[in-house]
């Protein structure tokens, strides 16, 4: 959720650190700070509440110099957003930044206070700084002091430690919060996300759970949780250097909405032919595993959970395999029964979602036949810890409100469903060809849906002064309605809820009045007539109806109901297609309201703490 950047170089690194923080702004934060030490052991620390730009201005004004440094953007967990609580934190000659939550910080704080340490902040991070300072008194090196310190910590952390008396190195530890090391020429870097470092290196190494690493200009040494030296794989990043550039778009979210046709094409490339799904593209042993699957368990959070809810309909109606979908933070604390030959699927854009990772680790102890992840970040923790990964190829998604990651997850899930049904001979060649044809057509159809932006922009004016909105859908369009309500509440701060339309009379009808917009997802399918009855229930109570309807569905607009006629598409991919106007609606409502579209208040892109 927070962002970390570190560097050891011959050149001044303050600008590199601040630029790295800029590239991590999408993760969400409330304050930022930087600390740099020079060859004369002079330490400069600057912290600011608010945007990274305020920190950048302070760094420029102070003319910060030095070749070793760490920087951080904070998203408050312990202690209010303030300059005092902002990182880095200092204890004597030790400076620390930290992502995560130290669960036993109160006990450690009491112990350290008994030793005479005075705390200046409300954060859990400050206990790390004091602990390292204490351990360094008897340790032979900073590395040893950090190794001893992390053994005393309970919780999640990605933490970097700098010693003013030894400006040639940084020591970093990782448990439950991602850290990547970037390799330069005569200089090395680290960050919580490789995106922060793409302007200085393309060669990266991800630390594993429990790793502690010592980084100098010329060398990186990694030790596992037992203190044994280990080698971790170094790989070349294929992320685009300009991924953090908005181009001509006003916001990252708008850019990412319009990148969806290309993202879907990239996600399908090499995985479908003109008439079939290439099962081998899912994984080396995918054909063998999918042939044995009797049950699918999907675990995810937020938007990824909504993608899983949509896929449940496909697994059961197309592939004939039972499927359960559960929120990761609930799944991991529930006593559950693992069904025979059950495949676990985790969904995550970042691959670092704390609850989803914890659910995966729990599930691996519970007898699932295999653990698969659908993820957008190669090298992430979910990818490394799963048995196999089916990657989305959405490209870097910076807007906090997920758009292209969601639709590429849906396309990936539909390809997986087709492969599973094919391997179990429940999807024949004719149906497989129909699904694949629909997938091939989808990018062009989404381009058509994007052309509705002006119409939806006008429609958005009706929502901007409302306090509540209700979304309705039936069948596989109910999760699409849920996702639409999530988008609206995330970025416009309008309270929005979604219901299966058949549930209206079981409570939500009590909310309907002339100030409650009701948005309906209305494709032409076997539930259309029942959906029309639900719409009439809203109409009879004076509700404001906005119906996104298939052009062949037979709706007619009047003073109580506005119709957005959507071109007819294959029923198989229609849930993906109807997502697009919902994204545009949320975006333009937020735009009218003047909210921070890309960085909504209180939210972060990657939720790496529980």
From Swiss-Prot:
Glutamine amidotransferase type-2 domain sequence ranges: 2-218
The EC number(s) this enzyme carries: 2.6.1.16
The chain positions of domain SIS read 286-426, 459-600
Q: Which reaction is recorded as catalysed by this protein?
A: D-fructose 6-phosphate + L-glutamine = D-glucosamine 6-phosphate + L-glutamate
Q: What is its main location?
A: cytoplasm
Catalytic residues at 2 (nucleophile), 605 (for fru-6p isomerization activity)
Task: Specify the enzyme's EC class, one word.
Answer: transferase
Q: What does the entry list under GO cellular component? A: cytosol
Tell me where it resides: Cytoplasm
Q: What are the entry keywords?
A: Aminotransferase, Cytoplasm, Glutamine amidotransferase, Repeat, Transferase
The protein's superkingdom reads: Bacteria
Matching NCBIfam families: glmS, PRK00331.1
Q: How does it assemble?
A: Homodimer.
Role according to the record: Catalyzes the first step in hexosamine metabolism, converting fructose-6P into glucosamine-6P using glutamine as a nitrogen source.
What name is this protein filed under?
Answer: Glutamine--fructose-6-phosphate aminotransferase [isomerizing]
Naturally occurring in which organism (per UniProt): Vibrio cholerae serotype O1 (strain ATCC 39315 / El Tor Inaba N16961)
Q: Which gene encodes it?
A: glmS
């Amino acid at each position: 959720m927070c962002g970390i950047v570190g560097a050891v170089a011959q050149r001044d690194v303050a600008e590199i650190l601040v630029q790295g923080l800029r590239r991590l702004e999408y993760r969400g934060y409330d304050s930022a700070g930087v600390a740099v030490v020079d060859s004369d052991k002079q330490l400069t620390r600057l912290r600011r509440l608010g945007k990274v730009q305020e920190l950048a201005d302070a760094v420029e004004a102070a003319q910060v110099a030095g070749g070793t440094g760490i920087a951080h953007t904070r998203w408050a967990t312990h202690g209010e957003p303030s300059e005092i609580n902002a990182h880095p934190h200092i204890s004597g000659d030790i400076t620390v930044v930290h992502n995560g939550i130290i669960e036993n910080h109160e006990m450690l704080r009491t112990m350290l206070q008994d030793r005479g340490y005075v705390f200046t902040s409300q954060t859990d991070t400050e206990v790390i700084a004091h602990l390292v300072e204490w351990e360094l008194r008897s340790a032979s090196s900073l590395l040893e002091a950090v190794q001893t310190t992390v053994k005393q910590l309970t919780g999640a952390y990605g933490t970097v430690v700098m010693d003013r008396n030894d400006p040639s190195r940084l020591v970093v530890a990782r448990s439950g919060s991602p850290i990547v090391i970037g390799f330069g020429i005569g200089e090395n870097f680290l960050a919580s996300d490789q995106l922060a470092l793409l302007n200085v290196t393309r060669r990266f190494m991800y630390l594993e759970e429990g790793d502690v690493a010592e980084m100098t200009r010329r060398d990186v040494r990694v030790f596992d949780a037992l203190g044994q030296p280990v080698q971790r794989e170094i790989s070349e990043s294929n992320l685009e250097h300009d991924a953090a550039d908005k181009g001509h778009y006003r916001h990252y979210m708008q850019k990412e909405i319009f990148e969806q046709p290309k993202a879907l094409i990239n996600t399908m490339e090499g995985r479908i032919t003109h008439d079939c799904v290439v099962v081998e593209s899912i994984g080396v042993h995918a054909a063998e595993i999918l042939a044995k699957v009797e049950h699918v368990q999907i675990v995810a959070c937020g938007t990824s959970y909504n993608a899983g809810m949509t896929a449940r309909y496909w697994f059961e109606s197309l592939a004939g395999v039972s499927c359960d979908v559960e929120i990761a933070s609930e799944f991991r604390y529930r006593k559950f029964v693992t069904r025979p030959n059950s495949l676990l699927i985790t969904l995550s854009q970042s691959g670092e979602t704390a609850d989803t990772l914890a659910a995966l680790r729990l599930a691996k102890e519970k007898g699932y036949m295999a653990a698969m992840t659908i993820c957008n970040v190669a090298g992430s923790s979910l990818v490394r810890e799963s048995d196999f990964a089916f990657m989305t190829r959405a490209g870097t998604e910076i807007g906090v409100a997920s758009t292209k990651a969601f639709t590429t997850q849906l396309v990936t899930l539909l390809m997986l469903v087709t492969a599973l049904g094919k391997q179990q001979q429940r999807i024949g060649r004719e149906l497989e060809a129909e699904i694949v044809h629909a997938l091939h057509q989808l990018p062009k159809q989404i381009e058509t849906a994007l052309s509705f932006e002006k119409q939806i922009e006008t429609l958005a004016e009706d929502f901007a002064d409302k306090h509540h909105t209700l979304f309705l859908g039936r069948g596989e369009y109910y999760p699409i309605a849920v996702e639409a309500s999530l988008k609206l509440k995330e970025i416009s701060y309008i309270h929005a809820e979604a219901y299966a339309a058949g549930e209206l009379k079981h409570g939500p009808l009590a909310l309907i009045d002339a100030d409650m917009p009701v948005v309906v997802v209305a494709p032409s399918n076997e539930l259309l007539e029942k959906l029309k009855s639900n719409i009439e229930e809203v109409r009879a109570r004076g509700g404001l109806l906005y119906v996104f309807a298939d052009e062949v569905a037979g709706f007619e607009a009047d003073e109580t109901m506005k119709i957005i006629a959507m071109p007819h598409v294959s029923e198989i991919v229609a849930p993906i297609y109807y997502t697009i106007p919902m994204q545009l609606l949320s975006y333009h409502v937020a735009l009218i309201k003047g909210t921070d579209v890309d960085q909504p208040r209180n939210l972060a892109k990657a939720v790496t703490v529980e």
